[in-house]
Amino acid sequence: MKFVIVLACLLAVVFANEEADVVKSDSEVNLLDFNYAYELSNHIRAVQTGALKEHDNWVVSGEYEYVAPNGKTVKVVYTADETGYHPKVVEA
């Protein structure tokens, strides 16, 4: 469920700017793990990896980055597991 929420948030950011083109897109989905990365022409980028652990718990880590309205780059590095979503926001 947490993965779905994080993915929905990232997709909302992606589709908020319909003028952006996909510059890079990679993904690999397996039964027990996954990873993906994308970069858009408007300087939004994201990377995420995840693995299925015991008792149907996913452990996910990743980061995304975008340019805020004030012109500064914002980067969020996060993990998500059975204890919740743990982001760390860095503004460059």
UniProtKB/Swiss-Prot annotation:
Name of the protein described by the UniProt record: Larval cuticle protein 9
Signal peptide range: 1-16
GO-annotated biological processes: chitin-based cuticle development; larval chitin-based cuticle development
Pfam families tied to this protein: Chitin_bind_4 (PF00379)
Function of the molecule: Component of the cuticle of the larva.
Record organism: Drosophila melanogaster (Fruit fly)
PROSITE patterns with a match to the protein in the record: CHIT_BIND_RR_1, CHIT_BIND_RR_2
Any one Gene Ontology cellular component term annotated for this protein: extracellular region
Gene: Lcp9
Domain of life: Eukaryota
Record-linked InterPro entries: CHIT_BIND_RR_consensus (IPR031311), Cuticle_Struct_Prot (IPR050468), Insect_cuticle (IPR000618)
GO MF annotations in UniProt: structural constituent of chitin-based larval cuticle
Domain Chitin-binding type R&R: 31-92
